[in-house]
Structure formats: C-alpha cells, structure tokens
C-alpha cells in the first residue's frame, strides 16, 4: 500500500507595488482579490501597506503603494498567484520571496 506524502508548507513573502492613482477602496479590493487567489493557503497575513516615492520612474509613475504580505503555500499556489499578478494591470511590480 502506498502512503501519500503531504506537501510541506513553505513560507513566502509577497512585495507588491500598486499604481498610485488608485484610491483606498480600489487598493482594498485588489488586496482582497489577492487573498482570494491565496485561499488555498494555510496562512495569509497582510503586514503593511504604504505609499512611497520610487527610486526610479516606472512608466509614468514616480510613486506607488507598497503592499507586503506573508503566506504559507507550495508550488501550485505560487504559480496561481504569479499568473494573477502578471495579468493584473493595477500592479506595477511584484516579487515573491521564499523565506
């Protein structure tokens, strides 16, 4: 009889830069959408959200909203999140780090 091994949960950190022309309600909706993508995750935690001046211009933007989140997941969850962030036009940049 085969025993199935459980996939280990891995800690990740998402740093996401959102366009500065969005209001607080739109930012909240974007964060909720990301949390919905991560619903399979064991843990999702919003660590911070700030507006900062960028070190260099990205497109026409000189500042942006930084969002930092932590979550536990594995490959399929991370790929699903990356796919969502790549097609999302409200985000400028993102980085997913394994902790």
Curated annotation (Swiss-Prot):
Matching HAMAP family: Ribosomal_bS6
GO MF entries: small ribosomal subunit rRNA binding; structural constituent of ribosome
Main function: Binds together with bS18 to 16S ribosomal RNA.
Keywords linked to the UniProt accession: Chloroplast, Plastid, Ribonucleoprotein, Ribosomal protein, RNA-binding, rRNA-binding
InterPro entries, sorted: Ribosomal_bS6, Ribosomal_bS6_sf, Ribosomal_S6_plastid/chlpt, Transl_elong_EF1B/ribsomal_bS6
Keyword match Ribosomal protein: yes
Name listed for the protein in its UniProt record: Small ribosomal subunit protein bS6c
Plastid recorded as keyword: yes
Compartments where located: Plastid, Chloroplast
Pfam families assigned to the protein according to its UniProt record, in alphabetical order: Ribosomal_S6 (PF01250)
Organism taxonomic ancestry: Eukaryota, Rhodophyta, Bangiophyceae, Cyanidiales, Cyanidiaceae
Species of the source: Cyanidioschyzon merolae (strain NIES-3377 / 10D) (Unicellular red alga)
Any single GO CC term annotated in Swiss-Prot or TrEMBL for this entry: chloroplast
Major subcellular site: plastid
UniProt GO BP: translation
Family stated for the protein in its record: Belongs to the bacterial ribosomal protein bS6 family.
SUPFAM superfamilies given in the database record: Ribosomal protein S6
């Amino acid at each position: 009889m085969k025993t199935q091994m459980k996939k280990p949960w891995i800690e990740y950190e998402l740093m996401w830069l959102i366009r500065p022309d969005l209001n607080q309600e739109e930012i909240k909706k974007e964060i909720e959408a990301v949390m919905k993508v991560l619903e399979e995750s064991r843990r999702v935690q919003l660590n911070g959200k700030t507006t900062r001046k960028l070190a260099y211009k990205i497109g026409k933007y000189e500042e942006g909203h930084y969002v930092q989140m932590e979550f536990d997941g594995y490959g399929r969850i991370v790929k699903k999140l990356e796919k969502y962030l790549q097609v999302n036009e409200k985000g400028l940049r993102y980085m997913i780090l394994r902790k």
